[in-house]
Amino acid sequence: MTLSPYLQEVAKRRTFAIISHPDAGKTTITEKVLLFGQAIQTAGTVKGRGSSQHAKSDWMEMEKQRGISITTSVMQFPYHDCLVNLLDTPGHEDFSEDTYRTLTAVDCCLMVIDAAKGVEDRTRKLMEVTRLRDTPILTFMNKLDRDIRDPMELLDEVENELKIGCAPITWPIGCGKLFKGVYHLYKDETYLYQTGKGHTIQEVRIVKGLNNPELDAAVGEDLAQQLRDELELVQGASNEFDKDLFLAGEITPVFFGTALGNFGVDHMLDGLVEWAPAPMPRNTDTREVTATEEKFTGFVFKIQANMDPKHRDRVAFMRVVSGKYEKGMKLRQVRIGKDVVISDALTFMAGDRSHVEEAYPGDIIGLHNHGTIQIGDTFTQGEMMKFTGIPNFAPELFRRIRLKDPLKQKQLLKGLVQLSEEGAVQVFRPIANNDLIVGAVGVLQFDVVVARLKSEYNVEAIYESVNVATARWVESTDVKKFEEFKRKNEVQLALDGGDNLTYIAPTMVNLNLTQERYPDVVFRKTREH
């Protein structure tokens, strides 16, 4: 049976994100994945090694200085017969909200682990997120050109700490200075390591068969014997790869390599395009939407300001769920019930934009946004429904923002509201006074806000501590009780960037007492966009 041209396009798409602890090598992997997809000819190592060629996927001013990817960018590249969309997620521990929402837009994740360190804190948190949707996970054990921990130990740690079975696909031969390559358990082939630096991909020599004397000659008898012994253990102790269990998020195929040395990344990519799911169905408040439907639907999972410093614009990132986007098509923005013609959608190669003529399920397109699009917005060809599962979290840290020049209040408010719409920070305006309080999930976000207010809105601001422990969105079906609650707690109430009523608690004790006192009021820790 031959598929229609539309279904062929859908079947080709793979959309994934990379999750890792900071410094496990995520940005390098991103570069090398693009290199193997031939998208970047000079895969820029982060921090540019003294040149101005900064890594292609880190592109805001502050990221360039810190060498961390703060904003999520999107890159599309061809690999074999597939078209792969890679969503780059902020690796720094502070940026969990943006990262969290990005993970709602992918069908699969690649977990990168520094093989010298093993499972780290941030990886645990991100895995919890992928668990909520049982996202399939591939694992890449990175940095084999350094001295690493025992590979069996690493697998045990992943299984015990992340509660997912490991199915090794490749197995390392030596490590650090003695790293000789990897053996592929399912192809019965050894790939010999030659370091490829920068953007050169070395021709890899392949030795067929585990008992081939060529193998002993190539890696030395000791390492060859060690490999055979380890493989006996591995095959006895670890899981066989099973595609159904992988798709259910129960086991993860594990690959070993070194992204910096351009080695092993292609084995992982081969696995990704072969096993990862084509675009998956999504739930809305009325029904499930599948990628094979020909009517267009999509949702916005991220908004980013000033991708182009020359244009003071914002771009909304939309994941296509079903149907084909064509230039100039009319779409309904469900939240405001308005039809809009979209003629200038963008596709991305981090920081380079090109106008897109068409896009299919799994693709991410950028919509120019002049303040009318919000995170979580659903676009359809007329059907009134809303995609669910795109969360907003109650922040855990709060600061008051103060102006150095009081005359710039208007620009400050505009800047903060725009930054909150894009999800970089949450802003709260207390009802009882003129303070501006910002809430974040991590400390680094406050520095980002101050830096961006200065560079993008020309507003010099400082932040100072404020007596707020936590915030909850409040609502109630009992109008009378809610009015009484609002009247008696006015001092603790604020409006967030989207004008939703929020209770700002000075202490957790205060929050608990207030919740007990008003059982008819719902205090929410997360809010659907």
UniProtKB/Swiss-Prot annotation:
Primary location recorded for the protein, binned into one broad class: cytoplasm
A Gene Ontology molecular function term of the record: translation release factor activity, codon specific
Keywords: Cytoplasm, GTP-binding, Nucleotide-binding, Protein biosynthesis
Domain of life where this protein originates: Bacteria
Residue sites binding GTP per the record: 20-27, 88-92, 142-145
Subcellular localization(s) per the UniProt record: Cytoplasm
UniProt cross-references to PROSITE patterns, sorted A to Z: G_TR_1, G_TR_2
Pfam families linked to this entry: EF-G_D2, GTP_EFTU, RF3_C
Gene Ontology cellular component terms for the protein in this record: cytosol
InterPro entries: EF-G-like_DII (IPR053905), EFG_III/V (IPR035647), G_TR_CS (IPR031157), P-loop_NTPase (IPR027417), PrfC (IPR004548), RF3_C (IPR032090), RF3_dom_3_sf (IPR038467), RF3_GTP-bd (IPR041732)
Protein family: Belongs to the TRAFAC class translation factor GTPase superfamily. Classic translation factor GTPase family. PrfC subfamily.
Function (record text): Increases the formation of ribosomal termination complexes and stimulates activities of RF-1 and RF-2. It binds guanine nucleotides and has strong preference for UGA stop codons. It may interact directly with the ribosome. The stimulation of RF-1 and RF-2 is significantly reduced by GTP and GDP, but not by GMP.
The protein's name: Peptide chain release factor 3
Species this chain originates from: Klebsiella pneumoniae (strain 342)
